[in-house]
């Protein structure tokens, strides 16, 4: 049974790869069509396009890394190839996490209602705020790349001094764990920011519901529905990201202790986030949901 597990996990990874490319490709396609037809696009739709593209890149990185790890081929990659592979992973993962976090901030500034002058100032300049945050995250990306490059250089120097198979395999595993740990630490910041956005949205919704109960008893309020939909999107991101974060954390621990089964399981769970969360974004967006249902109806009618 254990010998069949790599094949089973590989099939799951491939399924996640297909779902992820279809869902993220759908987001890009529909928004680009809308952009061409209307000659304009909202800020949230632009964020979704960039987020979907970054996730497509991340999904491809996950697939390539999976097969390299499965067949122990990563150690044979050249220094330049190793840098390209790891840097591509870092860049796609960086924008994947930060753009989803920025989306949470966007919903907070657009939907939440606070009387704080600072919040009102940011709310009036939401597009500039989003752009400044996006540019500011490049500092984290730059620092992450510098740290990883130092780890790569250190490992390559040791590898050139001692090229025996046993040393190379054990040292590469230690190097891989160090890379994962560094990436995990840099991933904590966007998760924390998204979590704070979620708490502020909850607080804003609670205040709004209390106000509605006092002043508008018996009436349905569309703003409450907007709050709820935004919370669903942010909660789904937090839950998927938490599973992604924990899977990475457990996978580098299992890799350190050479537990192959746990490592493969965690890698499979981690790939679920960029593949499936985009599908929830489609269902949570009125335009994308309508287009998806239309396509699904046409496909079903042809059967």
Swiss-Prot record:
Subcellular location as annotated: Membrane
Coiled-coil intervals: none
Transmembrane regions: 8-28, 56-76, 86-106, 129-149, 185-205, 233-253, 262-282
GO molecular function (one): bitter taste receptor activity
Protein topology in the membrane: Multi-pass membrane protein
Positions of disulphide bridges: none
Pfam families: TAS2R
Record has Transmembrane helix as a keyword: yes
A cellular component term, taken from the record's GO annotations: plasma membrane
Membrane-side (Extracellular) residue stretches: 1-7, 77-85, 150-184, 254-261
Entry keywords, A to Z: G-protein coupled receptor, Glycoprotein, Membrane, Receptor, Sensory transduction, Taste, Transducer, Transmembrane, Transmembrane helix
Cytoplasmic topological segments: 29-55, 107-128, 206-232, 283-303
Biological process, per Gene Ontology: positive regulation of cytokinesis
Function: Receptor that may play a role in the perception of bitterness and is gustducin-linked. May play a role in sensing the chemical composition of the gastrointestinal content. The activity of this receptor may stimulate alpha gustducin, mediate PLC-beta-2 activation and lead to the gating of TRPM5.
Note: Most taste cells may be activated by a limited number of bitter compounds; individual taste cells can discriminate among bitter stimuli.
Family indicated by similarity: Belongs to the G-protein coupled receptor T2R family.
Name of the protein in question: Taste receptor type 2 member 13
Organism: Pan paniscus (Pygmy chimpanzee)
Encoding gene, per UniProt annotation: TAS2R13
